[in-house]
């Protein structure tokens, strides 16, 4: 049995109150302050994971009890020792690979310092985050009746780690793609590269709102801390995959637009009859986030290496982890928004509201 660990942290108040209901009565700022002095702890033992190849894995969730606000506001050199301490706990439990969740892989140098301080390989899971965002977007577009080969796509944050690799791959599937970022020079370099290697018409823009208005599908991965997409920016029937943390899409889109589908990227179904994460993190049973799935896939494959670290992700990495996911029986299983699954009936309703009569067949991400 292969062993892995995944280090995570609370995203919002209910992540604390789920474990300690008494905290519902306490102001959230107080809870944040108290818990930032609490050392990392093992949350649960993960069992029952079995690949379709017969390989098995077990693992542990280890929590660093800091919220996104604290992680972003605390100096990086003070955050790293907290994550490293959690990593040492993982090593003591026998983990052969360690994954980093949510903001733990965003702060500072995206896992590089943490990996350097540990003896066990570390991955951010961003390769499969990109792969599943692409799969999720193409699947959602098909469910909304959008034919990818005729579609206009926009990638916001196109020059970042996940954004540039998403843009390179998405351009192979669509008619037209608009790359959005703040740095025009880097945008034009990426535009040139994509135009050379695909048949898509490639545009660049530094204005996300105008670029979004003409798009059938949008992948948002900007590191901007403010909201970039408002309800009035989207055309009816559009699909938006918001991979960014903090989010790029305003919560008002969900409240005011019943004719657009906003997803957080794919929910991944993890293989095994009796998969038990031993902890409720807001997903249906046997389902997990892509960065958790990447860590498990690497364990099952016995690829004990720093598969995804830092800010450079190659197309080959995304394609490889997507193939390995398929090999071991992991699949994108529906969609989620604000960490909650979106039921099929809701997707149907949104499609009808957009005036699209039926869904179409999704393209294959990896040929």
Q: For the regions a protein language model found, what residue spans apply to each?
A:
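A short helix-to-beta-strand connector/capping loop
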Residues: 56-58, 118-120, 197-203, 258
